A protein has these predicted regions:
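Sec-dependent N-terminal signal peptides
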Residues: 4-13
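Subset of outer-membrane beta-barrel
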Residues: 19-324
Length: 326
């Protein structure tokens, strides 16, 4: 009973925007983070397993791997950190295996920290004594398989194991799944090298273990993207995402993100985007930049929003390597 009560205190705390399960909603791909998180139909990359694994079938590369770091919600409290590793291997663009893992750290918890909302208390609302200070940790491990049907369509299924630990208090475990589709149609008759794509995904539906009250942030997303080469070494990609997030709690929201990426000389990328949401979400803008040198790509993004948005002034950094081309 005590364990269930403590869990309820944590899940109902309104001052923390990213609870144990909500780290799954943070986009670890810095490239699309700079495009207002419009990612379900964009060009596939190392982080496709978190966005739309089927898009990896249409990548120019047969193998990509990447690492990203996101110091999250610094305006709320220091100590929220997301680290992610992702990649894929494509078998002649007919089959692909995508993989990834995420580590999400929250600020240190201590019963003596009176200004922190996650103070563990008993049924009488008294702080529980004898509990050592600790940093909550959430981890996910992802594995996806994608299959290409014909020239234009790819399908994927992703399995995800999630574990959130609150020290000696309790541990939550869950298993989630994604199902996604990605289609790309070339527009060579209109412009050589141009294409249009569409994507759809249902993410993070599944079940929990250990009779926990874990609430997976199930989401349905659809989107489209247009890629157009400009001159010899320049290109433009514009993307839009529509998403509806559903959970059994009151945390339901609808949002739309629009993002643009301009690449100069196939080396320097400039990105921007804006996301709008209903009354249950937040509006925000993003900017980003990228630099590619040989097989190494470095990216940066920054999120700006009104003071009420806990994600404002968040930046993300990433480096990843393309190890094998066609």
């Amino acid at each position: 009973m005590k364990k269930i009560f403590i869990l309820a205190i944590i899940l109902l705390s309104g001052t923390a925007a990213a609870s144990a399960q909500e780290f799954l909603t943070i986009n670890p791909d810095v490239r699309t983070a700079g495009m207002a998180n419009a990612s379900v139909a964009t060009t596939g990359g190392a982080y496709s397993v978190f966005q739309n694994a089927a898009s990896s079938l249409f990548s120019h590369n047969l193998f990509e791997v990447g690492f990203s770091y996101s110091p999250w919600m610094r305006d709320v409290k220091k100590g929220y950190d997301l680290m992610a590793f992702g990649g894929f291997y494509s078998f002649n663009h007919k089959h692909s295996i995508s993989f990834g893992t995420r580590f999400y750290r929250e600020p240190k918890l201590s019963p003596d920290d009176e200004d922190y909302p996650f103070i563990p208390k008993d049924e009488n609302n008294n702080p529980i004594v004898g509990i050592e200070a600790f940093r909550p940790l959430s981890v996910s491990a992802d594995l996806a398989y994608s299959y290409r049907i014909g020239r234009y369509l790819g399908l994927s299924v992703t399995a995800r194991y999630i574990r959130s630990s609150y020290g000696e208090l309790f541990t939550n475990n869950a298993l989630g799944f994604d199902v996604a589709a990605y289609a790309r149609i070339p527009l060579n008759r209109m412009l050589e090298g141009a294409w249009v794509s569409a994507g759809a995904k249902i993410s993070d539906f599944g079940f929990t273990f250990d009779d926990s009250n874990y609430d997976l942030p199930t989401k349905f997303s659809v989107g489209g993207s247009l890629f157009a080469p400009i001159r010899d070494s320049h290109s433009l990609e514009a993307s839009v995402d529509l998403g509806y997030r559903y959970s059994s709690s009151e945390n339901k929201s609808f949002g739309m993100g629009i993002g643009v990426e301009y690449v100069l000389m196939q080396m320097i990328a400039v990105r921007g985007g804006y996301h709008v949401a209903d009354s249950h979400g937040y509006d925000y803008g993003t900017i980003g930049a990228g630099l590619r040198f040989m097989h190494l790509e470095l990216d940066f993004s920054y999120l700006f929003a009104a003071k009420k948005c806990p994600w404002r002034n968040t930046y993300q950094a990433v480096s990843y390597t393309h190890l094998r081309d066609h």
